[in-house]
């Protein structure tokens, strides 16, 4: 997905993202909440290194959460993350927003 335009420390350009919102939210709003994925791992506490996927390599930036209108963007499904990994990422997100 193309993340432009951005400002400051925000990531931009064409890159993979991980959808962290629930299916029903996505379906009824035509929106999705996503976290960016980068190709390197800087071992930051809010980064999660992907381990169980084949096509997408890198780290999920849990601090870079965005809501996107996926109908207005040129998106394509690549692969599904294992439930255990998604649960770990959700735990990091919950820690960031202190739920």
What positions do the PLM features span?
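Conserved functional hotspots at enzyme active or ligand-binding sites that engage polyanionic ligands
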Residues: 1-99
